[in-house]
């Protein structure tokens, strides 16, 4: 048996198996050969003709694609080279597989595994290496039979699925027809086409039962209509049916509106919860402005008289501080303050002194970390009747400091301690070595060496007059608690803010001893006074050790004479011009509530407290009066 007879027998079986109309398959199989090399293309054509295939050749991939598109049913197999100039063989493979669904055999001289794998993954049914042999081309017909069998199976599966779907539709149509027949008996047409109507209704019901309801997407415009409808009805009276009527939108059901309304109510509830939580936090921290809520968290320090919110930092109002200082109840003592109200002159320099704990006071406004440097002036009608344009400067306190020299600049430096609410004036070592020559005990630096500029020479030696009553050098200055401070222009009478107000302690309170030496120096209207003193006081006993009182003639800059006093311990002395501290001050058992705030309204923050070697707290700050 020859090869041709064997091929004819196989072809006959193939034709009968494939159901084709041709005899002796694969004789006459239509093959399209594509190769850019004319020699290879000619050899391939001769081999295909020896296999009795119907061959069509072309040297360009674009031409081959054009032939396939024009004659879709005129070819059974495509043999294409991989590397071509106008189009890659893999690209042609993809296009043929997508558009014509024909088996494609790749032909190349490159037999690398990656190249072969690439051709197979792109849909090639076989990959042949050059030069092609006749035995390989004689068996290429099997790819055509395999593709036809796969198509037949797919068609059979599609037919079976279609028949099943048709059966289900028929059952649904029959069920729907029965229902519609019952319902359509009452609504028959005038023409009597009951059967047609029932069939149409059954078809519609069958289609609606199999179709899936479209999902509603709430766009921005749709949500705006929903919100407008809810606002029009009110959130309490809004129901899905009314909202749907007001929206007047197609393809939206009542269930869709009900679901969206539930989500919208949950959203509003969450917003109200967040707003109430923020309001509660703001109320708990006491913050009026939400930007300062974090600052209000330090409100617990108010119990210790340390910090308080600063209302303003521009100027000090007399209503906040001085009015409370005028009343004895503000300090918890009686009889200390003079009946005349305290007046504060206009500040000409910046406030730059920490007055946080001067004299144990903690009321008023606070200015953070500031040192007060201001010129306090008194009224033109001053309390010194014999001084017309002098420059006496005094600080209200219990005693006066001794004098060192005259006709020098006077710079008053008072170092304050604010380690606790019961802090008093604490100084530091003298900054000028040649000035530290006295160690007399005192409480507040008071310049008493005052040089008259020649305007009036009739000043008494040691007697000062304030508002009429005669004031003795020691007792009057100690008991009056009000000494004017005068500048070049007498504008206001000011009580010293640095006075140490004695405070009543509990019996369990340990003594607070403060020791320091202060070197002060002020310049007032070309009058120069030097003072250097130290502090050594026990507050519970309110004792003054070795007090010295300056006595001088206030004329032409003569130096005063420092005369020692008798023992300064104050117990139960009944002096007309001197206060009884133990009787008046021990009435209270602690700081009153009005004193706890102190000068916190002036200074926002205290300086950082440090510790000396002996454990006495102090603050390295100063108060400078220029």
Swiss-Prot record:
Its main location: nucleus. The keyword RNA-binding does not apply. This is Two-component response regulator ORR24. Transcriptional activator that binds specific DNA sequence. Functions as a response regulator involved in His-to-Asp phosphorelay signal transduction system. Phosphorylation of the Asp residue in the receiver domain activates the ability of the protein to promote the transcription of target genes. May directly activate some type-A response regulators in response to cytokinins. Residues 30-145 form the Response regulatory domain. SUPFAM superfamilies: CheY-like, Homeodomain-like. Residues 210-269 bind DNA. It comes from Oryza sativa subsp. japonica. Residues 1-22, 151-215, 402-440 are annotated as: Disordered. The modification 4-aspartylphosphate is found at residue 81. Residues 9-22 have a biased composition (Gly residues).
